[in-house]
Structure formats: structure tokens, C-alpha cells
Amino acid sequence: MTVIDFTAEVEKRKEDLLADLFSLLEINSERDDSKADAEHPFGPGPVKALEKFLEIADRDGYPTKNVDNYAGHFEFGEGEEVLGIFAHMDVVPAGSGWDTDPYTPTIKDGRLYARGASDDKGPTTACYYGLKIIKELGLPTSKKVRFIVGTDEESGWADMDYYFEHVGLAKPDFGFSPDAEFPIINGEKGNITEYLHFAGENTGAARLHSFTGGLRENMVPESATAVVSGDLVDLQAKLDAFVAEHKLRGEIQEDAGKYKVTIIGKSAHGAMPASGVNGATYLALFLSQFDFAGPAKDYLDIAGKILLNDHEGENLKVAHVDEKMGALSMNAGVFRFDEASADNTIALNFRYPKGTSPEQIQSILENLPVASVSLSEHGHTPHYVPMEDSLVQTLLNVYEKQTGLKGHEQVIGGGTFGRLLERGVAYGAMFPDSIDTMHQANEFIALDDLFRAAAIYAEAIYELIK
């Protein structure tokens, strides 16, 4: 029996892997609804990245299919059983605070910096090369692989909804998504966004004209800006003291009797809100000391006094812990207030374990001083694949063999395409000692981790389909 050195096989293909990855990272594939149309369902960027990925697969001799620019796939091998690999080409907005251009991939000190380097273009390319090694070595296989790539994973997953409705194929029998971390993610909490609604009236000595913070529900807002006027005694001095006390950055700009106040924190993945510093909730806390009234006061009080650092929903009274899946988490992700609007919102993204539900959370939130509470159209229920499943066991065995580290199950708050299948998990590409920069400025993947992951993917895929 021939022993295959998958690490050596990756080494032979490192330059090609990086070249393909660079071609994907150079594409700004943020969702842009302002440019969406029938040909570009989520804007032109995600389509361009999808087309580039399928072009790479075409080049390497795989049969490919583009499903109306929502998603695409290529297939490898033959067999009745199908292994699904689910990845995505869309990225969250780059935001601010980068030391390099987020769409000019840059290698520095053994790290590859770019938006999408770790979520998810880097892991996708590593996994692609894992399968490519199997193909190029001509290894015997007994199952088919369908490698599916989406374009809306970071938003509502409308890409996968459309794909499965229109592709004309049954779902794969089992599979994984290279969109999280090793050793494995075999459980994922439920995911729902709930919106707090407020009127726009101002009746106090201080006036809130607007309040804006956050880019996506699944990102911790790095910064927020409010435009205010009225009785704001010692505004600059109070801001200076506030940002010094809380180790933040802030600034005030005056224009025609109005003050534009900005506070800057730190972005993070919305599934791990404690890893960030929510600039919006801190701005609301700062402003709440002034004499606002009516819905504007309610907006600032809830944002600054209840939502601030309420990562597990204790202040909101929605906290819940499951023995296996852990605690509920809450990210206050998007803030929009305009005094001229009758409907102003705060978007709260919950990652919830078994034992609670979106409706239960909603009923509790309705006790707040808000006009109403609504649910997002798209959500996901909790998902779990038992440790005893052969898929989980195979993936853990390969991880242990290649790293020398003990494998174990994990449940996360993040949502991945792995949950699209009843027997679906997430697998890599972050290692336990990796620095997680997903959804943050200066996102990167360590090159050593990228190549290690490719070798693990190669052996894991082979073990699943041989």
C-alpha cells in the first residue's frame, strides 16, 4: 500500500495555490444591493468572484455549473453517494482601520492579509487544492464530490435557497464546509436577527438628529456617529474624559450649530461579540447623559445602558444556557436613527442554543420601551451531528494524525453552510492556536496554516470518498 505524503504534495503546489487565491482575493465581493439586478442578484462583486472560481475549476478539467449567478458547483468522481463541500465567495464589508488595501493581497511576516483571506476564500482555495491533489494523483475513489460555492453566506443565504430550488440535483448525502476551525464544528447554535423599532420624535432640551452604526448584523460595529444639537454643555470635555476612561477613540465636528459625534471601538465577528468593542453602544452610553426625551431617549438608553456589553442577553432577560450547546449570545449589529423617520431600528443578532426560540426571545423584547419588535425573514435552528457519526470520526482522525493534537467536538455560535445537510459539519481552516481576524480589519491567514489546512483537506476528502 502506497503511503501518500499529502504535506509534500501541497508543497509542490504552493505557488499555484497562492496565485489562484490572489486572483480571488483581488475581487471585492461584498454584497451591494444598490447594484443588484437579475444578472447580479447580490451585486456584481459576488458574481465576479463566483465566475473566477468556476474559471479555475474549468481550467483544471472539472465539469462546472453556474446556477444563475446565485451559486455554482463542480463535480469530481463517480458513485451513488455524494460528498458535498460547501464554501462561499462573498465577504463582509471591509470597513475601516486597515493597514493595507483589503483587496490588494499582501504577504507580510508569513501572513496573507486581505478581506476574505480567512473567511472564506483562503480556506476554500486550500480545500480546492486538497481535492486537486486527489485528482492529479489519480487516487481510486468510490463516491462523487460536489464542490458548491455560494455568494450570500454572509447575509441571508438566499444563494443556497435558490441553488437547491433550481439546480435539479438532490442534496449531497453528507459533507462539510471549510469555513470555521479545526478540529471540527459538529454543532451550531440557532441564528436569528430581531429588530427593535422606534419612532423618531425628540422632545428634550437635547436633540438627536441621527444615529448610525454598524455594517452588518453579524459584525460588531467598529464605530458609530450621531448628529446632535441643543443643550450639550461641555460636550468636548465630556467626550475626552469618556473615551479616556473606556480606552476608545472619539471626535466631534461642528457644523451650523449641530455636532457630529463619533466613537470608534473594534469590530469582531458577531458570533463572538465579546471579542470586539461596540462603538455604537458606547456612543449611546455617552450621549445618554444629556437631556434627550421621548423615543430618542429610549433609543439611547436601550443602546447604551441595556445593550452595552450584554453579550449573553442578561440585561435583556433572554439569557439561556444549554448543557451541550452553551450560552446564547447577542450582538447589537446595526443602528439606524433619523429624526425624520417614523421607523428607526436596532438590529440584534442572536446565536441561541436548544431550549429557547426566536418567538420566545421576541416576546421578552416586547417588554422594552419600543414601538415593536420584528424578526428577520431568514433564520437557522440549532444544528448538531453526533460525535459517533462516521463523518465526524473520520475528520477527527485525519486531524489527529496530521497535527498530533487530540480531536474533540465543538459547538459554535457562528453559522456555516455545514448545517445545510443533516450530516453536515464545518471543518477548518483555523487551528486552535490561530489568531481569529474574521470580520475584522487586517484580516489575515498565516501561510503555514493555509498549507497545513490544504494537506488535511486532501487526506480528509480522500478518506471520505476512497
Please give the residue ranges for each predicted region.
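Short beta-strand
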Residues: 63-67, 251-255, 332, 375, ...
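Predominant activation on well-ordered alpha-helical scaffold segments within soluble catalytic domains
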Residues: 54, 125-132, 161-164, 197, ...
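Active-site metal-coordination/substrate-binding segment of hydrolases
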Residues: 82-149, 155-156, 173, 441, ...
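Acidic-enriched catalytic cores of C-N bond-cleaving enzymes acting on peptides and small amides
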Residues: 186-212, 217-266, 270-330, 357-372
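A generic structural motif
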Residues: 72-74, 226, 257-264, 346-348, ...
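Acidic/His- and Gly-rich active-site-bordering loop/insert found
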Residues: 2-115, 136-141, 263
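Acidic/histidine-rich catalytic neighborhood of metal-dependent amide-processing enzymes
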Residues: 120-201, 240, 310-324
